[in-house]
Amino acid sequence: MALLEICCYSAECAVTAQQYGADRIELCAAPKEGGLTPSYGVLKSVRQTVTIPVHPIIRPRGGDFFYSAGEFDAMLEDIAMVHDLGFPGLVLGLLDEDGNVDMPRMRQVMTAAKGMAVTFHRAFDMCRNPRQAFDKLAELGVARILTSGQESSAEKGIKLITELKAQSGVPIIMAGAGVRASNLEIFINAGVEELHSSAGKWTPSPMRYRNTGLSMSTDAEADEYSRYGVEGESVAVMKSIIERHHV
């Protein structure tokens, strides 16, 4: 049966995802940045309240996946923190200046992970040569690759996803980006083993007083009075579709 991973941006969302049937959680902060390393407080809370596997993302900033020496040092410290808190896995991705998997740094990551399962995230979709990158990640012992098939959505990238899946059973190919109940059967019928979805929506902030005259964001157009969270019913619907196909 296909595994359903839900991307969560708070401890509360992680609890919701678990309650509605998620098999695993990718834990992040900052949805508008595409996911950054969660705070220690959030990580600790999730370890105390969630029993299904949780894999935190290790990503110090938004943007590209070529990191400075200082940023990489911070990532190694965060990996140590995640390990010490007892998480079974983590999510990250590193590329070099030429868009290839940064093998020297990834070797350091695999050592620092100390047996935690490593997911190489959608940095894979920004690499120069996906088939070569797949082989390199297999060589490293990466557990899985999260990918949209180098397209804007996994549905559009299904051709590459199925081709990579056919190469080898390891790393596992996990489809992500625009995966939802309405297109889930495409991936299930293609034999994709793991599915990644945010299953979320933006909801209005509960604040009654709103100072609309200024913004705390560098994006002046950003709506600071909305919050992103997991929609439990969406998780439940996807889980039911997966279970129905397993019968």
Curated annotation (Swiss-Prot):
Provide the protein name: PF03932 family protein CutC
NCBIfam families this protein is in? PRK11572.1 (NF008603)
Does the record carry Cytoplasm as a key word?
Answer: yes
What family does this belong to?
A: Belongs to the CutC family.
Q: Which GO cellular component terms are attached?
A: cytoplasm
- List UniProt keywords, sorted A-Z: Cytoplasm
Q: Supply one GO molecular-function term.
A: copper ion binding
